[in-house]
Amino acid sequence: MATLDNCTQVHHMFAYNREHGTNYTRNHFRRYLAAQRIGFYYDWDDDVYECPTCEAIYHSLDDIKNWHECDPPAFDLNDFITDARLKSAPVPDLGPVIIEIPKAEEKQELNFFAATPAPEVSQWKCRGLQFGSFTELETSEPVASAPEPKCEEPARTIAKPEESVEQETRGDGKRLLQAQMEVDKAEQDLAFACLNASLKPRLEGRTTATIARRRDGCLVYKTKPSWSQRRRAKKTLKVDTLACENPYIPAIVDKISIAGGSSASVMHEQQKPKTLHTTPSRKVATHYKRTVMNQQTLMAFINQVGTILLNAEKEFEVVGCRKQKVTGKGTRHNGVRLVKLKTAHEEGHRRRVDIRIPNGLRPIVMRISARGGWHRTWTDSELSPGSSGYVLNSSKIIGKFGLRRHSIFVVRGRVDGEVIDSQSKVTHSITHRMVQYSDVARNFWNGYSTCFMHNTPKDILHTCTSDFDVKECGTVAALLTQTLFQFGKITCEKCAIEYKNLTRDELATRVNKEIDGTIISIQTQHPRFVHVLNFLRLIKQVLNAKNGNFGAFQETERIIGDRMDAPFSHVNKLNAIVIKGNQATSDEMAQASNHVLEIARYLKNRTENIQKGSLKSFRNKISGKAHLNPSLMCDNQLDKNGGFEWGQRSYHAKRFFDGYFETIDPSDGYSKYTIRRNPNGHRKLAIGNLIVSTNFESHRRSMIGESIEDPGLTNQCVSKEGDTFIYPCCCVTDEYGKPTLSEIKMPTKHHLVLGNAGDPKYVDLPKEAEGKMFVTKDGYCYINIFLAMLVDVPEDQAKDFTKMAREIAVKQLGEWPSMMDVATACNILATFHPDTRRSELPRILVDHATKTFHVIDSYGSITTGFHILKANTVTQLVKFAHESLESEMQHYRVGGEPDKAPRKPAGSVPTLGISDLRDLGVELENEEHSIRPNLQRLIKAIYRPRMMRSLLTEEPYLLILSIVSPGVLMALYNSGSLERTMHEFLQTDQRLSATAQILKHLAKKVSLAKTLTIQNAILEGGAGSLNEILDAPAGRSLSYRLAKQTVEVMMARSDMDKELVDVGFSVLRDQKNELIEKKLSHGFGGFVARTTIVWKIISNASLAAMAGYFYSRSNPNRRRRFERQIQYLGWICFQKRDLAPKGNLLRRSKES
């Protein structure tokens, strides 16, 4: 039968596996052989090494080499004594010797060390004395033995006297003792020779070893490695060789001279020793009394310490020999004090033996446990998760418990309904099936508590107390964790990776779903946690701090986006920062404050520059060199053929190709794709030229385009800001000022064509579109601009860019949008993705006849003669979004005309071109007398309800012109027009309703002012509130522009005069205001006087008719009462008694 003790070959181990059902491998066998070589015991089950001397456990040979400090067994002289020497020797008899001498020989030689036993006749009779053993003596010469007497001859018995016999006995004893001493000496020499031979390598190693101190304080020899010894031997051999080659011959030195001078002893000057002026230290060694305990004292000490540990629930460590130790702590379970030992499974290790308690330490652990609930009886149902390491009395447990081998039972876990002892060795299958009773919640709480206390703030000014319930605190902490992270388990790594991959918007959306419910839950169930509510509200405010007012951003860009001079440049930068909302960084917010400061300085010291320009001197030549595109030159973004690598951008570009491109089927030919129609006309693509003719004549004919009529250079070709040309937004001209006309553009397949200057750049379409031909749908040719911008977008931002372009830009642009809207959309995208501002655009052609922009794709154009737009980058194209830009092309459609193109999506702001305003008779800002006639129109409509209703319907913002004159504003307020405007437009136009409310408030304040100067100051102060309302988009109507101009003039006037008024100066404009007010009041007063006369006539006629009717049907008493009432009513109406109807009126009534 195979056993592991006689396992010398691998097949022995396999035979043992088959017999016992074990699974030992070759690795176990190798470790078993290694343990035999170093003299260790190998435990096959636990796969560990055990030292037979110190009983220490090691898991690998490296651990033995680094940590094993056990001393080897000492040698003894008995180890080298022969086995024969250890045998018991016969005791010689030293009594009288009777020697029988045969007759043949008179003299016989005695041999005490013969191998054959002596004859029974020859005996030594001695009592109580033993000198040594009678073993065989190692000798080379044989010892002659006494011959046996022959039977034939009779033996002679010699009787000697007693004295002679005694003397002979003494001589024999001396000889025997001398022989014994020689034997002992020989054996001793032999033993020491063997000892020297065995210790010679060890002693020779100590000659080169050094003495080192171990951790326990013992001094040991530390031998040097073999390579160091070899180097030392080689060096010694070299020195000996040199000594043999150049032997040293000693000589007597009788004179030493240093540089020919006197000897050193003569030149040396004797120096006096320095005097010590300090008191020497007197360090006295302190001798501590050594603590000595007997067994009784030691037990009492352990009892006292155990009581303290269990009561205070402190941690302790019982240390034994070398590295033997047991760690535990005091705890309470069901109100009983217990000892809880530190086990391996609580640290995350699953081992067959969970804890090893040395036999020498087990009584101490039991003694400490006895100070608690040692004598309490426990059942298995009282143990649950969290009970790991509890030390119980093995004789006091009842129920389903596993094997109990020791007096103490350490709880490990439960398997198959039984509670297992941590000291027991279990199989690997049980180890993995066992439900460990470690306290996961306690581990979490220990980590939380430790880190919480370690990071406690140091600047708390009060003493912290326990006011909240701990369970309620845990509930609120769980709510916060699930609100912010939303994990299925806090230990789940997949949830963490999923949370990490969320974008900023997705994360905000995810948190916003839960944060409202959490706030309501805390308010209702945990109202004391107000600090948590404040934190959640702050988080919600930060997450929702988005600026979705893209309309205001668009309007700002349209108004002043192209202005590069101060303060408009600061406003543009501020607008770009504000639109980011919560995505703006702290540095950007600091920059925003600086821009506000610059705007404030400008408003304080305002200046204006007048620029002039003329078409006669207009030149807008395009560069002959190609535009430098860094994205197409970076080696990291090019393949081995120099082509552009789309990377992740290729996948996200599908959002453009799927919705706004049409797949071309070459099998049906290209004829149906040749005509590119728009609402106002059409253009021929060069897609048919993809079928290339090899005939030179035919090929040359295909290179001839179809030209259209050239309108020449007109105001439609240029864009101005004031009188300054904005060249990127103008058509390209030659050096003589004539517009440059487009030529035929040859087609290509699967490319995106970029560049407006020099040679075009061909970029391969994304791999997602590989093998297919795409053409944009009608009305969506501007998608090529967004596709060109995608080239410069970083790969990790491609998803956000394409989603924003599709869901925000394209959704609002729709089909055939205006160039202003396209430029605004590009600016919004460039704000969130600044790298796209340098993106190179496809070539854009201008068709003034149909007021259309053509974005040329890879299929070119056969139609020629179009003007060429100079804008080559997104930054230059964005200038079309500025409202201050005076340009007809600003309102051209990218594929159609405003009156024939489909309606724009909801949310777009209606705009009118400058030429359209002139056609409608609208006066521009720079024309004189633009406010006065409209103010007169407002004054006429004050007391004409129908005219006022018509005015509010057509030009509602003319009401703001009333702030020019306090009298006009008061009349407008008294007429009730402001009140009617407020109520009528409350549902339809809240902006206009708010304007009427502000004017009503200003009228009330003006009515309380006593002087005209104060009234004008009140009106100028209220201009700021009206300006805030006018900043919202309101179109290009006449009333809006006039109101905006009037408010800005009043604000600027107030700001300029503020410093003078503050120091007490008065400006000359006060007299001017009096003249203006008098002139307006004169016209307005005449109208009021005429209205008063008409009112008197109507009122007298009405009273006369009433009086006649009453007199004809009343008695005299009632007539007199009626006369008094008529007089009183006249006084109330006219505030003068002489204006009341008198007796003539009554007399005429009586006569009638």
Swiss-Prot record:
It comes from the Viruses. The record marks 437-438, 895-896 as: Cleavage. Keywords: Host cell junction, Host-virus interaction, Hydrolase, Inhibition of host innate immune response by virus, Protease, Serine protease, Suppressor of RNA silencing, Transport, Viral immunoevasion, Viral movement protein. One of its GO terms (biological process) is symbiont-mediated suppression of host innate immune response. A motif (Involved in interaction with stylet and aphid transmission) lies at residues 489-492. Potyviral RNA is expressed as two polyproteins which undergo post-translational proteolytic processing. Genome polyprotein is processed by NIa-pro, P1 and HC-pro proteinases resulting in the production of at least ten individual proteins. P3N-PIPO is cleaved by P1 and HC-pro proteinases resulting in the production of three individual proteins. The P1 proteinase and the HC-pro cleave only their respective C-termini autocatalytically. One of its GO terms (cellular component) is host cell plasmodesma. One of its GO terms (molecular function) is serine-type peptidase activity. Its EC number is 3.4.21.-, 3.4.22.45. Residues 292-437 form the Peptidase S30 domain. Residues 773-895 form the Peptidase C6 domain. The N-terminus of helper component proteinase is involved in interaction with stylets. The central part is involved in interaction with virions and the C-terminus is involved in cell-to cell movement of the virus. This is P3N-PIPO polyprotein.
